[in-house]
Design a protein with these regions (language model features):
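Walker A/P-loop
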Residues: 14
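ATP-binding Walker
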Residues: 11
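Glycine-rich phosphate-binding loop used to anchor ATP phosphates in small-molecule kinases
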Residues: 54-103
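Small-molecule kinase domains that catalyze NTP-dependent phosphoryl transfer to phosphate-bearing small molecules
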Residues: 121-164
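P-loop (Walker A) phosphate-binding loop of NTP-binding proteins
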Residues: 8
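Hydrophobic anchor at the beta1->P-loop junction of P-loop NTPases
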Residues: 5
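Conserved substrate/cofactor phosphate-moiety recognition/catalytic segment
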Residues: 17-64
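Conserved phosphate-donor/acceptor-positioning beta-strand/loop module used by diverse small-molecule
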Residues: 99-119
């Protein structure tokens, strides 16, 4: 099973993924950001894009790696990654589903005040950081994403949220 954890920057995707990992069968955390950083770091500046989702190679590489991992790995796969574009869902998640690969696509919900508190008040981000500036775009996806199982994260611990996700199986 693949568990894709989508949500706004600062919602706690990675923390929830780490709490979820021991609750699943031999779970592996797959990090699409590593692929994105590798692609972006090796492209010249004139090919730089604002988000990894704008690189067709990022979409294709994540799809292929997740398919390969699912076919070869004896365990669950947890993917904590924000997707802002509908086309990214189609290019990765829908393709995997169309091939019969089981997936739980979860959107971790939070309001703007909670997200800012988690990022700014904790000292992880500056008020003018890229992640904070993109909160409105993330919230627009949160309200529009009809593909996902939505889980409210406000006032909840990562352990509590991860238990709810683990119970989805």
């Amino acid at each position: 099973m693949i568990y894709w954890l989508n949500g706004a920057y600062g919602v706690g995707k990675t923390t929830v993924a780490e709490a979820l990992q021991p609750q699943l069968h031999n779970a592996h955390i797959f990090d699409p950001e590593l692929i994105g950083n590798g692609i972006r770091d090796n492209y010249p500046a004139n090919l730089f894009r604002e988000t990894f989702e704008e690189y067709p190679l990022w979409l294709e590489t994540n799809y292929r790696l997740l398919k390969d991992l699912y076919e070869r790995y004896e365990g669950d796969i947890v993917v904590p990654m924000t997707l802002l574009r509908e086309g990214s869902y189609a290019a990765i998640i829908q393709r995997l589903l169309d091939e019969g690969i089981p997936m739980k696509y979860v959107y971790l919900d939070a309001d703007e005040a909670t997200l800012k508190h988690r990022m700014i008040d904790s000292g992880r981000e500056e008020p003018d950081s890229w992640c904070v500036r993109h909160i409105p775009a993330c919230l627009a996806v949160q309200t529009a994403d009809t593909h996902a199982i939505h889980i409210d994260t406000v006032g909840r611990t990562p352990e509590d949220i991860s238990q709810e996700i683990a119970a989805l199986t």
